[in-house]
Amino acid sequence: MIPNRSTMRGRGAASSAGTRGRLRLVVACCAIATLLVASACSTKANNNNSSGKSGGPNSVKTDIGVTDSTINLGILTDLSGVFAVLGKSVTQGAQLYFADLNKKGGVCKRQIKLNIQDDGYDVQKAVGIYADMAPNVLGFEQLLGSPINAALKQNIETDKAFTIPVSWASTILDNPNNMIVGTTYDIEMINGIQFLVDQKKIKAGDTIGHIYLEGEYGEDGYLGSKFAAKKLGLKLVGQKITATATDVTSQITALKNEGVKAIMLTATPTQTASAAAVDASIGLNVPLLGNNPVYAPQLLETAAGPALTKLLYVAASWQPYSGTTPGATKVRDAYSAKYPNEIPNGGVPWGYGAAAAYTAVLQKACENGDLTRDGMQKAFRQTTSIDTDGILPALDYSHPGDPATREVLIAQPDKASKGGLKVVQDLKASDLANQYVAPQHGKGG
């Protein structure tokens, strides 16, 4: 449901405590094919308040990014690149939540202030922006993009910057500073394939295809397909593509020649539109199942719209914009009032729910009297269950390194639904998903 890319990097405007390190070649998970990141800088910077000094109200201990009146949080996102639709919508969702929270007094008698920066889903640019932002924020309420999160993994660990990745790759579950809001790409795919079996669209012995991006995003989705195919007696044929590809005709044609009965997608929205159009035009007409970032409602206005409506299913662990839970309804009402002329998508409720999850940790840190970065990490480990009023399933963070939920809903493109998606199967975790153990599970903490 949430499609788009971002990037991140860090450069020296951080502080004298920042250290330059080599960054490896980062393969864009949802974005630019391959980017060489020259260097990254860890930012263990000083704040206006020294660590251990009273933060004012309630004598709360503070350090980086927190003053007597303000909690500064970073949002490093994509507002101009391939995942700009997603980046904009999740940011708007967060802004709605924090605006309402601030009207009610904020957290710990402090207002939440967001520092929002656009990296255009460029990894090198993101690393540099991160270095500039990190000395001035308590943590990152959003860090968009699997390749960017991978590039900044060591920086975030060293800086102890509590972060919500706008990425659902299981490969970053082992970072103790990351709070993944929702389930991971591999589990989305496992639940989705089980759905196709349950709906008798595929069966044991069938061949299925998977078109996936090189990098953390695509390969995590493919990991789920491999597990499900093995357990369900399916033959899997993979087709790896780069993030810059816009036409997947050759991949769909190759899969048709393999006799596939369904095609999985861990790709960009543009690639999804191409896949659906070709699937229909060459007479294949098999169902397509995608991870949450594969779709944007704007695609319904393209020539691929009818094929998407007929063939595509999207797996995600939160309500679409058209969701009917109390939380989803509240978000929709607030968004339509604030942005009456915008085209909404599933990123809006996720952004709102993620902000609520981050706030739950802030509130726990306040209760503990410690709004430092160390205090946030401690509070996170004590926040074992988060309720977002039905936007997401209950989120359980009591098992470091494991996904907070394994529940997924299935939605289909629908022009008549607000946000362009309708739910066809409510949130549930399949037995198959509950059996699954990813390589990083249990390693966080």
Question: Each PLM stretch: what is its role?
Answer:
Residues S42-K44:
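Bacterial signal peptide processing site
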Residues K338, P344-V348, T359-L421:
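Segments of small-molecule ligand-sensing domains
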Residues V37-A40:
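C-terminal motif of bacterial Sec signal peptides marking the signal peptidase cleavage site
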Residues I156-T158, S225-S317:
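Extracellular/periplasmic bilobed ligand-binding domains
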Residues N58-S59, V85-Q92, K104-L173, I241-V248, ...:
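Beta-alpha junction/loop-to-helix N-cap segments that form part of ligand/metal-binding clefts
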